[in-house]
Amino acid sequence: MPVLSEDSGLHETLALLTSQLRPDSNHKEEMGFLRDVFSEKSLSYLMKIHEKLRYYERQSPTPVLHSAVALAEDVMEELQAASVHSDERELLQLLSTPHLRAVLMVHDTVAQKNFDPVLPPLPDNIDEDFDEESVKIVRLVKNKEPLGATIRRDEHSGAVVVARIMRGGAADRSGLVHVGDELREVNGIAVLHKRPDEISQILAQSQGSITLKIIPATQEEDRLKESKVFMRALFHYNPREDRAIPCQEAGLPFQRRQVLEVVSQDDPTWWQAKRVGDTNLRAGLIPSKGFQERRLSYRRAAGTLPSPQSLRKPPYDQPCDKETCDCEGYLKGHYVAGLRRSFRLGCRERLGGSQEGKMSSGAESPELLTYEEVARYQHQPGERPRLVVLIGSLGARLHELKQKVVAENPQHFGVAVPHTTRPRKSHEKEGVEYHFVSKQAFEADLHHNKFLEHGEYKENLYGTSLEAIQAVMAKNKVCLVDVEPEALKQLRTSEFKPYIIFVKPAIQEKRKTPPMSPACEDTAAPFDEQQQEMAASAAFIDRHYGHLVDAVLVKEDLQGAYSQLKVVLEKLSKDTHWVPVSWVR
């Protein structure tokens, strides 16, 4: 067996150990692991570095002098004053090079052990009580980013104190600045008698590093853990337009339906949050859920928010004479059960009773739209497919999209078979085109809230039941339904996990046409009126129900809308989506 000498290094020891490893049937994995570790080049390099450092410690070298730079300058003066020969001229040139001067400066720094920064001395005219307080000097490197802290003047003591630490900012990452700390100096400038806006300007103008002289708070607050709560915003927010925010520059703007990561709820009025997917690591201020609800309640009481009556059905939801509810569901030679033109587009009158009250209950007590807590969700194999809900404005023609999707893949997609009190025709089959029931049975189911929505056409009742939707989903098919937006609240449950798609027609700008004869004026007017109605209906749905929507499709033509819808449906079972947190708990 080889013997190590006293001068053998660690890397030589590792090499010897590797060669001495012998196969062992009982410890194959352990032996293989050791062989891999000992053979790693990076470990060998580390051992060599370790040996060099140990050798340096044993030698314990001391510098010959502590001022090599000064010596070099003296030599250069002598060379410049004396008669210059070729060797002297070369030496003078070498001593003048920036690289050699830098090496000499590093030598002096190491020799003098001048590693720590020199702190500025305390001023002579210091307050008497200042000596008794613990002063902390904090130096932060913040580049061009904000400090990530807000300040205010204490009403009682008049001191400038740290009011808030923004999560993810330079101050938060340092862990050295806390809420309640008193700020005395910024880069050597006393701030005791300066206004907060002047101090903020000094902080903003400081580039690279910034030195703060602070007095720690008497009761230093513990650093709280991030809450990691995700919220979907149900409203637009611009801090520049918010007079109540304590610091507009610290505010976080966001759009409706944007997902926010709330990292701090310490303040009951102003939360700290980040936009999911944003590269900016610093959090910003947003109004808390409770504070925003109080503001909306106040505005509603003051009459600056829409009244409950304004949420009732607008003029666009009127009968469409061009479509009826008895059209067959044929497309490309295939018959698809349950497909028919929507009875909602026929002459519809809501029946009275409990269902009417249920459908209008949301209009009587409209909720205050602030935030909705959400979580990531991905469809798992063996799990029932999510319900796909289509809502559309005037001119969306949702039934065409449903027909095309189901006809293309009837094994994967399906539609709910509606109920009707209309007599069955000779070519119709029970449970295929419709579920044919008596008026008494229909009204009984209506009384027990079994219908998602219903309508009346030519004295016959039509409706879509929740059981019909459940029957399609039980077959492991994706059920497509098109409903009025009022029905969304009833469908947004963990049972259905609906994915809501808003389909709206492309609104063309008013076309410029040459002057027309009086005979043509009547034919041009309906075009503009129809465009206005379509735009108004889309705006109404977006205003009152847009916060519930997961995807928006703009329909210019059937094929284009179908292509968009197909992409959305393909991603539905593959991608991760944000859903209400109650759906996944």
From Swiss-Prot:
Superkingdom field: Eukaryota
Pfam short name (any one): SH3_2
Every L27 domain range: 6-60, 61-118
Protein localization: Cell membrane; Apical cell membrane; Cell junction, Adherens junction
SMART domains the UniProt entry points to: GuKc (SM00072), L27 (SM00569), PDZ (SM00228), SH3 (SM00326)
Guanylate kinase-like domain sequence ranges: 385-570
GO MF entries: PDZ domain binding
Keywords on record: Cell junction, Cell membrane, Membrane, Phosphoprotein, Repeat, SH3 domain
SUPFAM superfamilies assigned to the protein according to its UniProt record, in alphabetical order: L27 domain, P-loop containing nucleoside triphosphate hydrolases, PDZ domain-like, SH3-domain
Cellular-component GO terms for this entry: adherens junction; apical plasma membrane; cell-cell junction; plasma membrane
Domain PDZ: 137-212
Keyword RNA-binding: no
Gene3D superfamilies cross-referenced by the UniProt entry: 2.30.42.10, L27 domain, P-loop containing nucleotide triphosphate hydrolases, SH3 Domains
UniProt tissue specificity: Expressed in retina (at protein level) at the subapical region (SAR) adjacent to adherens junctions at the OLM, and at the OPL.
Signal peptide: none
Sites bearing Phosphoserine, chain numbering: S307
Annotated InterPro entries: GK/Ca_channel_bsu, Guanylate_kin-like_dom, Guanylate_kinase_CS, L27_C, L27_dom, L27_dom_sf, MAGUK, MPP3_SH3
Occurrences of domain SH3 (ranges): 226-296
Complex and partners: Interacts with HTR2C; this interaction stabilizes the receptor at the plasma membrane and prevents the desensitization of the HTR2C receptor-mediated calcium response. Interacts with HTR2A. Interacts with HTR4. Interacts (via PDZ domain) with CADM1 (via C-terminus)Interacts (via PDZ domain) with CADM1; this interaction connects CADM1 with DLG1. Interacts (via Guanylate kinase-like domain) with PALS1.
Function: Participates in cell spreading through the phosphoinositide-3-kinase (PI3K) pathway by connecting CADM1 to DLG1 and the regulatory subunit of phosphoinositide-3-kinase (PI3K). Stabilizes HTR2C at the plasma membrane and prevents its desensitization. May participates in the maintenance of adherens junctions.
Family stated for the protein in its record: Belongs to the MAGUK family.
UniProt name for this protein: MAGUK p55 subfamily member 3
Protein source organism: Homo sapiens (Human)
